[in-house]
Amino acid sequence: GGISVDDSKSGCICHSSSPASDLMVTLSGLPATYDAGVRYNLTVALSGGPEVTSNPTNQGGFNLEASAGDLSSVDSNTQEKEDGSLTHNSEGNDQRSWKVEWVAPADDSLRVSFTLRGNAVNGDGEASEEDHWNEAEYTSKGSGYEEESPGLSTILTIALLLGIACRRRLRY
């Protein structure tokens, strides 16, 4: 079970050809600003999408990637992939909400990006256009993160160009 990262990069196309606006994929518990090395309990949730048919199994799945830090499973409903991403497993595809853990990187100067892809299915056991998927991007900045500002060389280059432009105007 589970969604591979390669499959999920273009969406969950085995379930539907394009993302569905009626399906919300959310990652809660992620701090806007993280502290280095701290463990954060996160919840992946799907809302909307197709109604589950008479069979309440096979309701959905997800794939979560982080650009830094470590994602890990906290129960038997998710699994860690070799590339460091997390996904649901066969036990975890009978639901639309999962608990996971993220350990923030030791470097608190980073801006960490998260990509969450999820699919909500109708439970009929058939991959079809009736199943929906969507994706969302999230970020968390380290407590030591600093927005990039123009460096001195950039400022000097701009000043030089302005000086040349002004000098040329004065010659005419």
Language-model segments: residues:
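Positively charged, low-complexity intrinsically disordered regions
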Residues: 89, 168-172
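Short acidic DE-rich linear segments
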Residues: 147-150, 171-172
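Sequence context surrounding c-type heme c attachment/ligation sites in exported
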Residues: 1-148
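A cross-kingdom C-terminal cell-surface attachment/processing module
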Residues: 153-169
